[in-house]
Amino acid sequence: MADSPRSPGAERKLTLDPRVAERLQHLTLTATRAVEGFLAGRHKSPHRGVSVEFVERRGYVPGDDLRHLDWKAFARTDRLSIKRYEEETTLECTLVVDASASMGYPTDGRPTKYDHACQVAAALAHLVLAERDGAALALFDHQLDRVLPASTSPAHLLPLLQALVERAPGGTTDLNTVLGRLVERLPRPGIVVVISDLFGPVDTLASGLSRLGARTHDVVVLHVLHGDELRFPFDRLPRFEGMEEELRLLVDPRSLRPDYIAALEEWRSQVRRACTARGVDYHVVDTTAPLDVVLSAWLGARMARLARRG
C-alpha cells in the first residue's frame, strides 16, 4: 500500500476526556444485552453448541444426542424435545474510518470531520476492548490505506490511536472498491462500523454495503457531517471550493440556503434508504454534538431496533 499522508508535525495527540470516558463506561453497562454483543461480554452465535446459554427447545428426531433431552418438558407435555444452546463467542468489530480529503473540512483551524471520526472510532475501540472483544481498524480514501487486524488485548488501543492520528485527510473516495476489498480481508463475520461523510455516488455506497451484507456482516454506518454542512450558516459572500474536486463557486449563501437544505435532505434520504434496504444501521453524527451524546443516541436507536426485531 502507498505511504499514508501525515499531518503536520505528527505530534497531534488523541485522548478521551476522563468525564466522557466515565460516561462511555456507563454506556457499556447499560447497553450490554441490547446491542447484539457489541459492548457485551457474553455473545450469542448461530453455531449450536453445548456451552453456555439455554435458548429454546425443538422436537426430538432419531439420532439426536439423548443427553440433551428435556425430561422436565417431557413430563409436562408427553413429548420428547431437545434443548438448544448458543455458544458464547468473541466478537470482532472492524472500525472503517474515512480519511479522504473531504473529511478535512473545515480548513480554518476548527476540528475537522476526520478529527471527530477519530474520536468516535477511539471511543468505540475503547468500549470494545474493555469487553475483551476484538477491535480492528481500516483507514481508507479511494482504497484501503492501512489495516490493523483485530486484537482483544487492551494494549491494542494504543496502535489504533496512533494509526488514526498519524493519518491526514487526503485523496478521493471509492466506497464500493474499499468495502469490496475489506470483505476480502475480514476472516469471519462480525460487526463493521463505517465512519464516513459518504461523499460520493449513493449507488457505490449501496454496492459496497451489499457486498458486506452478503458475507453476513452486521454493518453500521455512522454518517459524519459537520454542523456547517447540516445547517449552512453562511451569511456573507464566500467562495465555495470542492474538497475532492476542482470546483469553485461564488454565490449568495442566503439565496442558496433553501435549495441547499432541500438537496441535502434528499441526499440523506437516499443514503438512509440504501442502508435500510440492506439491513444496515444508519445514524447521522453531527460534529457539534458531544461525543457521549452521539454514542448514546446511536446505541439507544440500535437497542430499540433490536428490540423490535425481537
What is each of the regions a protein language model found here?
Residues 156-190, 202-204, 225-226, 230:
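Von Willebrand factor
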